[in-house]
A protein has these predicted regions:
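N-terminal active-site segment of His-dependent metallophosphoesterases
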Residues: 1-40
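Glycine-rich phosphate-binding loops of nucleotide-dependent enzymes
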Residues: 35-39, 44-283
Length: 283
């Protein structure tokens, strides 16, 4: 998918008293795109609108050059758009396969077809090279494994665009690296991925482009290999002077970021080369 969001796109957050302006005049090419910005900048609002979770008051969304209306998550799913938001719900008394198909069960003549669902569940988990067993109770999985199941669930309808809202939130460095390896596989299969993420080491480890949003406006779109932590943080913070930029560049936190990114890069490389799991998904 190639996404174009035209200027003056408004969306009302649920429970909010007034409309929140988000202005975008950018092409998002078929890449693994990371959207970054401060809290309240409009990152999650943007992907909620594309996902059909929020409706724009006005403004336009174009997919592949055609103006579209996305009135619901169900319609987004039909259009080949899948999403994973924070706080995905699972039924702890069900296994992995049943959670993957929750609300989308396969039936044959009115009878639930567990064999077909298990087969399809193995297939989507194999796509991610995950060794999670389809018959495992979801309650037995770690936070990182649950996030993997949430990502696998997006693949059931073979989407062309996948939206991820903070996919590595609350994960350890090693868990994050494993989930990021799965996300890279989605991109390697030719799918477009748009990811909201606060953690810059994760952003730099997997993204092709970084979109910076500040106060509802896209302030820059950067090729990841051509930018730096300092430049992105300065843009997020609205730094305008050379002195302010130098203060950011000299911050000791950057050494920690660089070390964390190197660890993530090594872990992702190993996962991509050898597979994150040891075997194919089993019952």
């Amino acid at each position: 998918y190639r996404i174009v969001l035209i200027s003056d796109l408004h969306a009302k957050e649920f429970g909010a008293g007034n409309e929140k302006l988000i202005q975008y005049v950018k092409d998002l090419h078929p890449d693994l795109i990371a959207i970054v910005g401060d809290n309240g900048a409009g990152k999650s609002t943007l992907i909620k609108v594309i996902a059909g979770f929020l409706q724009p008051g006005f403004g336009h969304i174009y997919l592949n050059g055609e103006q579209v209306t996305i009135p619901s998550i169900r319609e987004a799913d039909r259009m080949g758009i899948a999403s994973v938001f924070q706080g995905q719900e699972f039924c702890d008394n069900l296994d992995v396969a049943s959670n993957l198909f929750l609300g989308k069960e396969i039936n044959q003549i009115g009878i639930r077809d567990d064999d077909s669902m298990n087969s399809r569940a193995r297939s989507v988990l194999k796509t991610l090279s995950s060794a999670i067993r389809v018959g495992s109770p979801i309650a037995s999985l770690s936070v990182g494994q649950r996030q993997t199941v949430a990502i696998a669930r997006t693949l059931l309808n073979d989407p062309q665009l996948i939206l991820l809202d903070e996919p590595t939130a609350a994960l350890s460095v090693m868990q994050s690296a494993e989930v990021l390896a799965y996300i890279k596989r989605l991109r390697s299969e030719g799918r477009s991925v748009v990811m909201v993420c606060h953690d810059l080491p994760d952003v730099f480890a997997v993204s092709d482009r970084i979109v910076v949003i500040r106060q509802g406006h896209v302030t820059g779109v950067h090729r990841t290999v051509e930018t730096s932590y300092e430049e992105i943080i300065a843009e997020i913070a609205g730094v305008t002077t050379e002195h302010e930029y130098e203060e950011i560049a000299e911050n000791p936190k950057f050494d920690s970021m660089v070390r964390q990114r190197k660890l993530i890069d090594r872990t992702i490389s190993a996962a991509v080369s050898h597979g994150t799991g040891h075997d194919s998904p089993l019952d």
